Amino acid sequence: MPDGAAKPSRILAWLVHAYTATGAVLAFIGAWGVVHGDDRLALGSMFVATIVDATDGALARRARVKEVLPDVDGGRIDDIVDYLTFVFLPMLLLEAAGGLYRFAALPVIAVVLLSSVYGFVAPDAKSSDYFFTGFPSYWNIVVLYLMLFHVSPGMNAAILLALSALVFVRIGWIYPSRTPTLRTLTLLLASAWAVLLVVIIWMWPFPPRAIAIASLLFPVYYIVLSLVLHARRRPFDAAQGRPFVPAQGGPAR
């Protein structure tokens, strides 16, 4: 350790892991809301879980948790709680809210759940140049907007199936807090978007339509920027999870 460098704290590292793990509690709170017909509680818990997920990585790097607690896999904790709060809970909420036809609910949700498992375990799920590969299981956001704009059950099913297919399409989607291109603008827009979502959830089920429409700006920005940057990236070596650099004089594999 360099002279004068602060010694990493085991207590702080454990607190960061505990912070990540609160996502499991938030998943239960959200499920409690679904069971008791409180959609706002369910949506609120998913929103808070998203904030936790957006901030715990930076805290973990600052606390140097991999160095201090090498036997505790924070990434695995993150994956468990993300699957609960980004995938399982949103599907539970959408079904309970009548967002899918009863005959189609189980098969459609099964496709979402199973495709998302692959999305979490794929070797190139996160690249070294800070992209997610394949649709990154933003089901919490998808379900919020399907419910917010009262999309029909048939269209809901079509959207869920289409996005499930995109899990397997190796398109890179930006990692909002880490992709360097336009990072400052992305974080500013994401922060403004978060404020709008707080208003929407607080006023649920009747938020002002103007706010609902304005909140679409960031998702549209996210999709457009992801597609533009993906088109500019070099060929991607999925097996190694990094941009593939072909041997001199030889074709890219």
Sequence positions of predicted segments:
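Alpha-helical transmembrane segments of multi-pass membrane proteins
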Residues: 46-53, 111-119, 163-170, 215-222
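Active-site-proximal cofactor/substrate-binding loop regions of enzyme domains
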Residues: 4-65
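Short, amphipathic, aromatic/basic-enriched membrane-interface segments that mark the entry/exit
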Residues: 8-18, 72-80, 125-133, 176-184
